[in-house]
Amino acid sequence: MIKAGAIIAIGAIMVSIAIAMYFYDQYQPNFSYAEAGEPIQVGPVRYIVEYDGTHEGDEDTVPENIFVKIRIKATNLSDEDTRMSGGQFYIVDENDKKIQPVYGDFSDEDLLDYYLEPNKESTWTTQFDVPFDESKQWKIGIKPTKVQSSLDIGVICLLNC
């Protein structure tokens, strides 16, 4: 009687561990890696991200360091409009410190908040206030928006990877 109870208890523990591992595996992010200028898909959107230089801001927004600007070409591969936001992007320095973009009205191409139509391509820019050094390693991270409900995360080597 005690042996049967022990076997049932051990079996229940094994089943619960198997279920927990299944759900853990289902909700792990899927990392995709690319070089600057190469296409990368995050959720329903294919991106091409390139380094677009540096700038000193404008009269309204002056950086603490310098603005590093990236050019983002995005194509919506789904059948529905999808939201695009500058907050999806972050720059990562060689110490793995994530830095969010700085929003401003620097040009007509600035990505603030936009809905990308199905099978359409658009190009935007965004910038990051960082202590930029061209000899250091810089990466761009791309997260999907909440509406895109994807576990994909894109990592793009911007410089010196």
Language model segments and positions:
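Sec-dependent signal peptide cleavage junction
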Residues: 20-34
